[in-house]
Amino acid sequence: MIKPNIPAPVRPNLPLSSPDSVLPQAMKDPFNIFDDDEPSEDTSSSEQSSRPPPREMMISSSCALREQTNSSFLNRFFPEDDESSENGAALAEINQLLRDGPEAPPREPTPKEARRPEKMQKIFFQTYGNDFKVEAHGDRLLAQNQRVVRLFERGRILGLGVKMNIPMGYCAVTNCFHPPGCVCVMDMAGYGPSDIRAQIVNISSGPLELPPNMLQIHIHMLPMLLPEPWQTINLMAPHQGDTYFDLRLRRPLSLPPRASKNLKFEAGHLCEEDARRCLVIPCRHLATKRVLLDPTVWRPNSLAVLRVLNASDEHVDLEAGMAMAKIIFTTPGITPFKPSLTSVMMSFDVPRSDLKLVKGGRRDYYRAEERMRSGRDSSNEG
């Protein structure tokens, strides 16, 4: 069988004599496929009109080359650093190193500060009665009288309506802005369940009445730190459990009425102020005799000097060996200040701490008490 001679298909727009008539435009000049300039003068007008745009880069009627997109596949394995890549910071750093040359040492990256874990210890308290309004302000309580407080010649002890379980290693200190005519004696409550009270001493010549909201008593929770034995000089051993020291009289003391004296104790300590702060707090039994002791901050490498005031109209005799003040070593930052011009005693400015006082129910209160009892029993057994 003889096959018929079938001619090849011919494009009607181009002549057969042209050798490039069957080739696409991209194959005629392979070195000019990315050239966006005007075509050369040798090409005809029909070839210029049929040339595809450079972005598509047509090779044939059925195949097209497209622009390559940026791949984000490797970003899963090599994540970018937000701080170094922000606003081209990494590229600018490389360019700076190239300009400086190999002699300049590379710049060390700034270390990031480790974030401290937030550890806040909660201490539960309960309120009772209607004589005082108690509010929690973070690490401290504020008690304000809601009724008129009447003070007799010597003064009185007021229950603030606050019960709390003080954990081991802490103490509660009452601090007050002294109203005119009276002094709120600074007092300390140690480890265990405590009913917080305040001692008000009348320093006027007659009875005194305080209107509502006149007494503003702050209750601070302070950690009690125990110094090393070599850091104390002529101080007796601290009390077990409460971790505080005593300052006692070595000879009898006689105070005239309405007179003050500076007592010097031959004792000292070597604790640095940046690590610990030594507080001198008066003993509560002095308030019954209307003897006031100015609370102060005991500086290191110095003798203890205390100011004692007899607020009564009679002579007061104090025996030798009587405890005059309590010594507490706590966190730094506490400074003494005078609340007002009429104040005869100093107060303490206590900075904020990580403690949080929370008003809880009976269940929370008794649970904390059981924990303290179990810890006390285990320590006694040990």
From Swiss-Prot:
Single GO BP term: dUTP metabolic process
UniProt feature, compositional bias: Pro residues: 1-12
Bias (Basic and acidic residues) ranges: 100-118
Pfam family, one: dUTPase
Residue segments, region Disordered: 1-60, 97-118
Keywords: Hydrolase, Magnesium, Metal-binding, Nucleotide metabolism
UniProt keyword Hydrolase, yes or no: yes
Reactions listed under catalytic activity: dUTP + H2O = dUMP + diphosphate + H(+)
Pathway it works in: Pyrimidine metabolism; dUMP biosynthesis; dUMP from dCTP (dUTP route): step 2/2
Cofactor: Mg(2+)
GO molecular function, one term: dUTP diphosphatase activity
Enzyme Commission number: 3.6.1.23
InterPro entries: dUTPase-like, dUTPase-like_sf, HSV_DUT
Signal peptide extent: none
Domain of life: Viruses
Keyword Hydrolase: yes
Function: Involved in nucleotide metabolism: produces dUMP, the immediate precursor of thymidine nucleotides and decreases the intracellular concentration of dUTP to avoid uracil incorporation into viral DNA.
HAMAP family found in the cross-reference section: HSV_DUT
Protein family per UniProt: Belongs to the dUTPase family.
Protein name (record): Deoxyuridine 5'-triphosphate nucleotidohydrolase
Organism: Murid herpesvirus 1 (strain Smith)
